[in-house]
Amino acid sequence: MKSARRSSLVVLAALALSVNGRAQGPGTDYSKIEILTEKIAPNLYMLSGSAGVDPGHQDAAGGRIGVLAGPDGIFMVDAQYAQLTDKVVAAIRKISSEPIRFLVNTHLHGDHTAGNANFVKMGALLLAREELRDEMARPPAPSANGNPAPARDPARLPVVTYGLGDPVKLRLNGEIVDLIPVRAAHTGGDTMIRFENADVIMIGDFYRNYGYPFIDTNNGGSLKGALEALDATMRLAGPNTKLVPGHGTIINRADIVPYRDMILGVQAKVQQMIAQGRTQQEVLAAKVTAPYDGKVPGGLLPAGAGTSADRFVSMVYQQLKGGR
């Protein structure tokens, strides 16, 4: 609790002043990526990389960025690939000339955090989960899709941290911003960012509307936590709340229901086969995702893809066998 109070004091001090790289996509040609801007509320924007260039994210290169603009300075959610920082800054400058003061990370992966150091060097204060900082400070582990993690750079590490039971509330630019930690879901250090007045929640990668769920168990993610995070999202969101995933199009609360039901359906089938003594290979051969493959965009991705059906089912099997 002491660390939480210190974190809150640092945040408040920084706010007072403001008022007075998942691993880089293999084979990605960053020179071909454009940063696209979508206005989602009066002073809230979503920045996205253009589609079809990043092999790891065909729908849009890298992760989504949130930008809250106003006289108190720019508040950013996530930082994209480091190679795209200049393009991201150029897109922000078309929105506002105010300094970039705050940056919060939804989770560990380099497509959301690799640009951290660049923005910190511009003067941004970096906030994230204590668990995320711990993950980023450890020697790199490969992510669950086999990509190497980005090399550790101390400048990428959060300065202000908060724990699972210590949500942070910021007030700036006429908005109330809630940093809401969730249990180990996509990774072990996930955060949802809610903009109360705009009725927008940025939910990171524990939901995606392209491919099957990607739960990075190498970096603390868990199937149980992902389901809990989806439940938490449905509790927080109203019928008109805009939910911004780390990848894919903006959704609403109703879109979470079939996604969660799909996970529960696959989980139940895999659990049944485990009880029958089936091996992982036998479960994969049974094609337990077949009822969903035609409904999930990208549901028929090749087996090697990070969000393919086979990788998802393998993760579910391993989590259930491990009792998690």
Predicted regions and their residues:
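Accessory terminal helices/loops
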Residues: 12, 21-25, 235-240, 249-324
